[in-house]
Amino acid sequence: MSNRAEKKRFQQDLAADVNHLCQRAFESLVIVHNGRQGAGAGMIWHQDGTIVTNYHVVRKSSLRISTLDGSEYTAEIIDRQKKHDLALLKIETGEELVPAPLADSRQLRVGQFALAIGHPWGQVNSVTAGIITSLGSIPLRWHRGAVDVIRTDAGLAPGNSGGPLLDARGQVIGINTMIMGGDLGVAIPIHVVNDFAARKIDQDHAR
């Protein structure tokens, strides 16, 4: 087999692998419509209709959610936190939803494969790939103190905000939140998101 044929075969296999990895996550990916500001991404966190997205995506109180099958729902903001740029939404669908599969972001290492999914520039269910370039705490423009983040070279654009960052198994390792330096994506680690979301869900289910 020639080098050109080998390269083509590798690209085809890689594309098939990436598509397979993303399918489960796409089931949990939503579009967050926030009026005139446009749209961001979000992720089904719990089967009861709880959704995680970015704080900056939901500054408007009038929100609509579109799911993978094209259904639309009115969303209620049930909690938000500016420090980590996180927000929890709730939709009522009358049926159980498919929550995203989660990884343990505390086990991540620099150099690992990463996939960002979302709706950049209105392109629904788009995927970009890269690696984790650094891990650690950095100051963010909306918070004076340092915040734990994942930085990757997987391309982000408006419409990726609030969408998941996946590992090589298709599990969520973070929530994409901003672009830094023009070419690095920044995500909030999923263990930080879990601490934020779990408290609210546990409180609601305890009532």
Regions found by a protein language model. Name each.
Residues 45-46, 57-59, 102, 108, ...:
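Short, well-ordered loop/turn sites that connect or cap secondary structure elements
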Residues 32, 62-68, 114-118:
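Short conserved beta-strand and strand-loop elements enriched in small hydrophobics
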Residues 23-24, 78-85, 135-150, 199-204:
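Gly/Ser-enriched beta-turn/beta-hairpin loop segments
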Residues 43, 155-175:
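Catalytic nucleophile loop of clan PA
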Residues 13-20, 28-48, 71-74, 127, ...:
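A conserved glycine-rich beta-strand in the N-terminal activation segment of trypsin-fold
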Residues 1-22, 75, 97, 116, ...:
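C-terminal cap/linker of serine protease catalytic domains
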Residues 1-2, 26, 46-86, 94-96:
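Catalytic-histidine neighborhood of serine endopeptidases
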Residues 100-105, 109-147, 157-160, 177-185:
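Flexible, gly/ser-rich surface segments that form the specificity/activation loops bordering the active-site cleft
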